């Protein structure tokens, strides 16, 4: 369990509790979680973070009424900046989106502006929102992570408790390489409910070559680890930066959806540009 799992900042969350579903607009349903909870223990300060990035959300269950009462549906794309004070707690996000269901809006842009305003207020940071009509996305191909998949290794694993031990001496030689590694075996668990979170991860770096077996063992050790998606990605980034000391590093995870939402955080210290096309499990 993470050291801050019982922090008072988490006590008021609806996550893990029985809740009523409202279908009329209510911005107060949104709840934020301070990013400092997992940054402070590592000595990471908001004015001197070793990375940049965003939390990319896809909203698959978004519906409201137009001015005449006719239901509208859209797919939403949200990007929440890494500098925001809070991340958005996903169950509260789902409950908030449900509150749009029987609410009338004059037009699509009013919905977009409402989402952007409320999410920015909750996160205390920069948020951008785009809404897509279904016919804009129909026929869109399933994407994939570019890079070398490290999953097909003939190794024995019998320990699934999180540890950074595998990253000790995980680099070798003096030759500098530039490569992109991919794994679909990332599984962590919700910080509060301990429900499983399934994801694929892409690690792009320039530096001394990272031992792929040790890296895979490290990623598999998240299997019993309890943290939010965004926190796991930052943990992986910082662990790799600390132990492997690459010149450039980017870590990008795309998680499967839950409650009509998927979360796709990325962190980088280079000019990394993430692909936003959904993967096969999304």
From Swiss-Prot:
Active site feature: 190 (thioimide intermediate), 197 (proton donor)
Pathway membership, UniProt: tRNA modification; tRNA-queuosine biosynthesis
Broad class of where this protein is predominantly found: cytoplasm
Binding residues annotated for NADPH, in chain numbering: 90-91, 258-259
Protein residues bound to substrate: 88-90, 229-230
GO cellular component: cytoplasm
A GO term, aspect molecular function: preQ1 synthase activity
Compartment(s) where it occurs, according to its Swiss-Prot or TrEMBL record: Cytoplasm
One of the GO biological process terms: tRNA modification
EC number, as in UniProt: 1.7.1.13
Catalytic activity: 7-aminomethyl-7-carbaguanine + 2 NADP(+) = 7-cyano-7-deazaguanine + 2 NADPH + 3 H(+)
Alphabetized Pfam families for the sequence: QueF (PF14489), QueF_N (PF14819)
Entry keyword set: Cytoplasm, NADP, Oxidoreductase, Queuosine biosynthesis
Self-association and partners: Homodimer.
HAMAP family: QueF_type2
Family: Belongs to the GTP cyclohydrolase I family. QueF type 2 subfamily.
Function: Catalyzes the NADPH-dependent reduction of 7-cyano-7-deazaguanine (preQ0) to 7-aminomethyl-7-deazaguanine (preQ1).
Annotated PANTHER family: NADPH-DEPENDENT 7-CYANO-7-DEAZAGUANINE REDUCTASE (PTHR34354:SF1)
Name of the molecule in the record: NADPH-dependent 7-cyano-7-deazaguanine reductase
Lineage of the species this protein comes from: Bacteria, Pseudomonadati, Pseudomonadota, Gammaproteobacteria, Enterobacterales
Name of the gene: queF
